[in-house]
Amino acid sequence: MPVTMSQAFIDNFLGNSPKWFKIAILSFLVINPIVFYLNPFVAGWLLVVEFIFTLAMALKCYPLQPGGLLAIEAVIIGMTSPSQVLHEIEANLEVLLLLIFMVAGIYFMKQLLLFVFTKMITKIRSKVVVSLMFCIASAFLSAFLDALTVIAVIIAVAVGFYSIYHKVASGKSFTDDHDHTSDSHGEGHSLCEDELEAFRGFLRNLLMHAGIGTALGGVCTMVGEPQNLIIAAQANWQFGEFALRMGPVTVPVFISGIATCFLVEKFKWFGYGQQLPEAVHKILSDYASYEDAHRTKHDKIKLVIQAFVGVWLIVGLAFHLASVGLIGLSVIILTTAFNGVTNEHALGKAFEEALPFTALLAVFFAIVGVIIDQQLFAPVIQWALSYEGNTQLVIFYIANGLLSMVSDNVFVGTVYINEVKAALLDGQITRDQFDLLAVAINTGTNLPSVATPNGQAAFLFLLTSAIAPLIRLSYGRMVWMALPYTIVLSIVGILAIETGFLGEMTQYFYDSHMLIHHSVAEAAKGAVTGH
């Protein structure tokens, strides 16, 4: 039967996506202008829900195309303007540069990272200990590096492990070329499905623990997350003061997070507790031995160079010697120059992982433009400001948390701190209350947002990365595996604020002269525009 033009159009539209998904996206494109004409506010929230839907279907169809179509239509019908989208991209240029250069830079440090983490996994047999090490290492790194950088590192390691196992299990040697994305191979070799599933589960566990670790560490310091920098600038806090003010909330949360990691692994809850199969452990151990035996002086000097560049990376970011993206660019230049990677094709491979996500983030900023232009969050902010004292802090924490679960936490944190700054300058709140609110906003945007990949850019990057389909890490599975952490981190954060512990410890820091009282004039002088 010949294919009609309409059938060909539907077949081509969004490629191999399910037909129902294609129809859903086309329906959204038809419905949105009508709803916008009737009620712009409702249309704005409808668009946000639709965009979240495209993210949830990331394994069926990469969100750039369906989300991009929704964003383009939103601009065309006037929900936001091209200038507003450009403004959002300009305000978040550091995040885009981070994705373009830092993730590519990490690609050229993969040998060192694979060396370190292979040793960690092959030498330590206890899954609980390995999980705790991944979580704590991610938290420590995220306090100095951006969470996206840390997740990029862990993804690179996981892909390395997966490809090594897949290659050997498919009947090839360590040095052979191999496509690790295909589970069917000729020559009579077939992968053991149970073994492969168990290994996928093991890698899922490690990646989720690492992802949560980035949130635990990222909330602690002003360089941990992009919104932390914006909040610190608004409040005129330096590195030490930021960490100290966050401490009454972040320290109990960190301890609780590590305890949760231990418990879910020990009792195999929420899909955790997957053991590394003995056969896979043997392959990885053999690979480590093979690499050690065949490591030439050229290989060893490459590892040394990568280690030195790694030190520069941590020092450069910890002391904020340049913007994150530019430090990433320097990592690319230093590792490739001293390790002899001068072929354009070899350089290009490093950018394959991050550029689709960079484009997706630019689309996300178009949705953020709609949220701003249609004032979708305005009612929530006004309601939260109507309360006082500890109750106000808790409400801001919860309101930030709920919105960060469905929207980018950089955006949510920026909107809230700007609104609270405006309230301070209007005389609605005192400077000390503003400082406490800044802590509530920072912790509120960073901690509950682990609930879904929407809030944490690092989680979204993980969901849309090359490793996710290989280890069967879907949107729903991420939400389920993050659930125990979401509950524990959110509740401990609320209790630290609700019980007055944050206020009491902050007062103690004032009395001990570890902190100083800031003035409203300082805040007015230090105002930055953020978004």
From Swiss-Prot:
<feature type="transmembrane region" description="Helical">
    <location>
        <begin position="97"/>
        <end position="117"/>
    </location>
</feature>
<dbReference type="GO" id="GO:0015385">
    <property type="term" value="F:sodium:proton antiporter activity"/>
</dbReference>
<keyword id="KW-0406">Ion transport</keyword>
<feature type="transmembrane region" description="Helical">
    <location>
        <begin position="23"/>
        <end position="45"/>
    </location>
</feature>
<keyword id="KW-0050">Antiport</keyword>
<protein>
    <recommendedName>
        <fullName>Na(+)/H(+) antiporter NhaB</fullName>
    </recommendedName>
</protein>
<comment type="similarity">
    <text>Belongs to the NhaB Na(+)/H(+) (TC 2.A.34) antiporter family.</text>
</comment>
<keyword id="KW-1133">Transmembrane helix</keyword>
<keyword id="KW-0915">Sodium</keyword>
<keyword id="KW-0739">Sodium transport</keyword>
<feature type="transmembrane region" description="Helical">
    <location>
        <begin position="352"/>
        <end position="372"/>
    </location>
</feature>
<keyword id="KW-0472">Membrane</keyword>
<feature type="transmembrane region" description="Helical">
    <location>
        <begin position="130"/>
        <end position="164"/>
    </location>
</feature>
<dbReference type="GO" id="GO:0005886">
    <property type="term" value="C:plasma membrane"/>
</dbReference>
<feature type="transmembrane region" description="Helical">
    <location>
        <begin position="451"/>
        <end position="471"/>
    </location>
</feature>
<feature type="transmembrane region" description="Helical">
    <location>
        <begin position="478"/>
        <end position="498"/>
    </location>
</feature>
<feature type="transmembrane region" description="Helical">
    <location>
        <begin position="307"/>
        <end position="327"/>
    </location>
</feature>
<keyword id="KW-0813">Transport</keyword>
<comment type="function">
    <text>Na(+)/H(+) antiporter that extrudes sodium in exchange for external protons.</text>
</comment>
<feature type="transmembrane region" description="Helical">
    <location>
        <begin position="393"/>
        <end position="413"/>
    </location>
</feature>
<keyword id="KW-0812">Transmembrane</keyword>
<keyword id="KW-1003">Cell membrane</keyword>
<feature type="transmembrane region" description="Helical">
    <location>
        <begin position="206"/>
        <end position="226"/>
    </location>
</feature>
<dbReference type="InterPro" id="IPR004671">
    <property type="entry name" value="Na+/H+_antiporter_NhaB"/>
</dbReference>
<dbReference type="Pfam" id="PF06450">
    <property type="entry name" value="NhaB"/>
</dbReference>
<keyword id="KW-0997">Cell inner membrane</keyword>
<feature type="transmembrane region" description="Helical">
    <location>
        <begin position="244"/>
        <end position="264"/>
    </location>
</feature>
<feature type="transmembrane region" description="Helical">
    <location>
        <begin position="66"/>
        <end position="86"/>
    </location>
</feature>
